UniProtKB/Swiss-Prot annotation:
The N-terminal domain is composed of the N-myristoyl glycine and of a cluster of positively charged amino acids. It is required for inner plasma membrane targeting of Nef and virion incorporation, and thereby for infectivity. Residues 140-156 are annotated as: Mediates dimerization. It is found in: Host cell membrane. Residues 88-96 are annotated as: Acidic. One of its GO terms (cellular component) is host cell plasma membrane. This is Protein Nef.
């Protein structure tokens, strides 16, 4: 109700794929092209796909971006600074980045095996996560999207520790994380797109691997995470406590 033009029209909701592409990538969001062994990027405001081992043509100066993981200072410090800035940014502008309703559109519900399968296929048909670089920020955006749009409580998305392929620990989620080798040309210069997820993904991973999402329909029937790494489920593994703790310790995985 009220006079015409008195209400401010909100921007139409974007799809999950676009939200994830815009996360931390700026104008350099992209995918891993497995067949070509390269990643593809999409310029903001354009549907044109560009293939490149780096984001050429964009000049960056140190200090332009608080979140840019520069080579100096030391690698460990830059990793920690990147992670902290990444999480600060996630907390500060989630609503602007994800652009979903503040409250869930449907009643909250826990993730189930059937629901995880359905959501996996739904995401795939809507453009999907296939070949998209994984990051902590995109992980959180996916959680927020499914909670606000589908009412799914965000306590389900976990993956095995690694290194190597990371299998979903929730049975029925059909997206696993696969490490890829990203071309290293230009990594020691300041002219490539240092904020591209292909460059920053490794800072989010304890093993320094660059990961991409990959759809695997067989995960609907085979609980690979539990079969391969039961110790990561702790008391739920069915193993004696001494055994699963010993396995975690041998793999260098902290436990309480």
């Amino acid at each position: 109700m009220g006079a015409s033009g008195s209400k401010k029209h909100s921007r139409p909701p974007r799809g999950l794929q676009e939200r994830l592409l815009r996360a931390r990538a700026g104008a350099c969001g992209g995918y891993w092209n497995e067949s070509g062994g390269e990643y593809s990027r999409f310029q903001e405001g354009s549907d044109r796909e560009q293939k490149s081992p780096s984001c050429e043509g964009r000049q960056y100066q140190q200090g332009d971006f608080m979140n840019t993981p520069w080579k100096d200072p030391a690698a460990e410090r830059e990793k920690n600074l990147y992670r902290q800035q990444n999480m600060d940014d996630v907390d500060s502008d989630d609503d602007d980045q994800v652009r979903v309703s503040v409250t869930p559109k449907v009643p909250l519900r826990p993730m189930t095996h059937r629901l995880a399968i359905d959501m996996s296929h739904l995401i795939k048909t809507r453009g999907g996560l296939e070949g998209m670089f994984y990051s902590e920020r995109r992980h959180k955006i996916l959680n927020i999207y499914l909670e606000k749009e589908e009412g799914i409580i965000a306590d389900w998305q976990n993956y095995t520790h690694g290194p190597g392929v990371r299998y979903p620990m929730f049975f029925g989620w059909l997206w696993k994380l696969v490490p890829v080798d990203v071309p290293q040309e230009g990594e020691d210069t300041e002219t490539h797109c240092l904020v591209h997820p292909a460059q920053t993904s490794k800072f989010d991973d304890p093993h320094g691997e660059t990961l991409v999402w990959e759809f695997d329909p067989l995960l609907a029937y085979s609980y690979e995470a539990f079969i391969r790494y039961p110790e990561e489920f702790g008391h739920k593994s069915g193993l004696p406590e001494e055994e699963w703790k010993a396995r975690l310790k041998a793999r260098g995985i902290p436990f309480s």
